[in-house]
């Protein structure tokens, strides 16, 4: 009996997390179909799990980045520039794909939904201003509000200052980052329970009946995200690593995308991505900065959402769109997507900004936003899964490419 108990504990603490998550997913679906009340009650597990991830993510980013910068050795590469370049290329490519799909399969909307009572940003300048104001945020305020741009700036600044500190100070910071990482691993082991609760409560609260009226729009949105995840991202990774990209892409989708799909929060998924980067044996100096940065500005899914819904409004109103305007929309959607994390309501509240390019009134644009909230149970989940998994994919691609270059140099030096 004791042996069976120890085996069960061993499976819970060291078993395959992906298999456990799939079990939690299946159990959540079964519970929601059997008892709505029990499923709603199980939602507490999901709320606690997402809350725990959101609680630990800001301090994890602060400590990891600060420790990484403070202990950085002179001449050691961090690879941030090439990773940032891939983030921007990926987001713009996603916006282009969304334009192409919207032209090939135009969606129309019944614009009679009640406008959401939220004020969207008035222009790109306001979005960029919000992003820049995040940089100069009070550090305590940044930690409390999970402002990752502000946290990154303070972490890098403190890390640079601590470079001049004593060895014991640097060791203390490094030990503190390891301690926070250990807490994160414990939280992540509760993912199966969290996803069980999230799935059960979501199905019990909404079901999927409300989504059938927007089936065509959802097919274009999710089809675009799948195309980016399974075709565009692998092409970008192949261009970088010059080998089969699918083992890396599929692993990131499985281990990062699945969790992000159910938590629906890029910030909450930062600890999951950090742990995956550690498992992939990537350079900590690179991923400790690139992952939280990606959670803020790498928004391929948001670019697709903004573009598809804006063009759905355009098609509904019978407005003609030429190639030049479509390209401009891709650029605008990419810039908006990069600022989506700094806007309450995320990508949906940036749709009026894209609609304004076509002279669409704010009243109609906010009705499009209301449609976005209706389909959000799937749209937001798929968007977050694409955004978050892409952070790891591009970070890993750059790190692996740099490792391959170093190995080649060493081989040539030995000849």
UniProtKB/Swiss-Prot annotation:
<keyword id="KW-0769">Symport</keyword>
<dbReference type="InterPro" id="IPR001991">
    <property type="entry name" value="Na-dicarboxylate_symporter"/>
</dbReference>
<feature type="transmembrane region" description="Helical">
    <location>
        <begin position="358"/>
        <end position="378"/>
    </location>
</feature>
<feature type="transmembrane region" description="Helical">
    <location>
        <begin position="45"/>
        <end position="65"/>
    </location>
</feature>
<feature type="transmembrane region" description="Helical">
    <location>
        <begin position="217"/>
        <end position="237"/>
    </location>
</feature>
<keyword id="KW-0029">Amino-acid transport</keyword>
<keyword id="KW-1003">Cell membrane</keyword>
<dbReference type="GO" id="GO:0032329">
    <property type="term" value="P:serine transport"/>
</dbReference>
<feature type="transmembrane region" description="Helical">
    <location>
        <begin position="193"/>
        <end position="213"/>
    </location>
</feature>
<comment type="function">
    <text>Involved in the import of serine and threonine into the cell, with the concomitant import of sodium (symport system).</text>
</comment>
<dbReference type="GO" id="GO:0005886">
    <property type="term" value="C:plasma membrane"/>
</dbReference>
<feature type="transmembrane region" description="Helical">
    <location>
        <begin position="21"/>
        <end position="41"/>
    </location>
</feature>
<keyword id="KW-0812">Transmembrane</keyword>
<protein>
    <recommendedName>
        <fullName>Serine/threonine transporter SstT</fullName>
    </recommendedName>
</protein>
<keyword id="KW-1133">Transmembrane helix</keyword>
<dbReference type="Pfam" id="PF00375">
    <property type="entry name" value="SDF"/>
</dbReference>
<feature type="transmembrane region" description="Helical">
    <location>
        <begin position="83"/>
        <end position="103"/>
    </location>
</feature>
<keyword id="KW-0472">Membrane</keyword>
<feature type="transmembrane region" description="Helical">
    <location>
        <begin position="331"/>
        <end position="351"/>
    </location>
</feature>
<keyword id="KW-0813">Transport</keyword>
<keyword id="KW-0997">Cell inner membrane</keyword>
<feature type="transmembrane region" description="Helical">
    <location>
        <begin position="299"/>
        <end position="319"/>
    </location>
</feature>
<dbReference type="GO" id="GO:0015826">
    <property type="term" value="P:threonine transport"/>
</dbReference>
<feature type="transmembrane region" description="Helical">
    <location>
        <begin position="142"/>
        <end position="162"/>
    </location>
</feature>
<comment type="similarity">
    <text>Belongs to the dicarboxylate/amino acid:cation symporter (DAACS) (TC 2.A.23) family.</text>
</comment>
<dbReference type="GO" id="GO:0005295">
    <property type="term" value="F:neutral L-amino acid:sodium symporter activity"/>
</dbReference>
<dbReference type="InterPro" id="IPR023025">
    <property type="entry name" value="Ser_Thr_transp_SstT"/>
</dbReference>
<dbReference type="InterPro" id="IPR036458">
    <property type="entry name" value="Na:dicarbo_symporter_sf"/>
</dbReference>
């Amino acid at each position: 009996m004791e042996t069976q108990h120890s085996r069960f504990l061993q499976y819970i603490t060291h078993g395959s997390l992906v298999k456990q998550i799939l079990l939690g997913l299946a159990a959540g679906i079964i519970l929601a179909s059997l008892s709505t009340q029990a499923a709603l009650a199980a939602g507490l597990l999901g709320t606690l799990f997402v809350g725990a991830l959101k609680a630990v993510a800001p301090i994890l980013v602060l400590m990891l980045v600060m420790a990484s910068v403070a202990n950085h050795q002179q001449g050691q590469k961090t690879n941030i520039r090439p990773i940032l370049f891939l983030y921007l290329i990926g987001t713009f490519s996603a916006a282009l794909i969304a334009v192409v799909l919207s032209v090939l399969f135009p969606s129309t909307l019944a614009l009679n939904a009640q406008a959401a009572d939220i004020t969207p940003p008035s222009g790109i300048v306001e979005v960029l201003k919000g992003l820049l104001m995040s940089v100069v945020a009070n550090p305590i305020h940044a930690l409390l509000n999970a402002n990752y741009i502000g946290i990154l700036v303070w972490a890098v600044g403190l890390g640079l200052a601590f470079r001049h500190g004593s060895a014991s100070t640097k060791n203390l910071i490094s030990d503190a980052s390891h301690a926070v990482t250990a807490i994160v691993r414990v939280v992540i082991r509760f993912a199966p329970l969290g996803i069980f609760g999230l799935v059960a409560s979501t199905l019990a609260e909404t079901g999927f009946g409300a989504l059938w009226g927007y089936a065509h729009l959802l097919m274009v949105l999710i089809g675009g995200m799948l195309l980016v995840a399974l075709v565009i991202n692998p092409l970008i990774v192949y261009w970088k690593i010059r080998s089969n990209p699918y083992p890396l892409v599929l692993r990131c989708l499985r281990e990062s995308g699945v969790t992000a799909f159910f938590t629906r929060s890029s910030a909450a998924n930062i600890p999951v991505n950090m742990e995956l980067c550690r498992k992939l044996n990537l350079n900590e100096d690179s991923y400790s900065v690139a992952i939280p940065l990606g959670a803020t500005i790498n928004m391929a899914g948001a670019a697709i959402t903004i573009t598809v819904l804006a063009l759905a409004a355009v098609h509904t109103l019978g407005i003609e769109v030429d190639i030049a305007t479509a390209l401009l929309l891709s650029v605008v959607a990419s810039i908006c997507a990069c600022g989506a994390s700094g806007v309450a309501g995320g990508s949906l509240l940036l749709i009026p900004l894209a609609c304004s390019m076509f002279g669409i009134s704010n009243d109609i644009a906010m009705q499009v936003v209301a449609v976005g909230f209706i389909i959000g149970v799937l749209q937001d989940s798929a968007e977050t899964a694409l955004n978050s998994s892409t952070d790891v994919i591009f970070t890993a691609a750059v790190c692996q490419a740099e490792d391959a270059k170093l190995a080649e140099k060493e081989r040539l030096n030995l000849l």
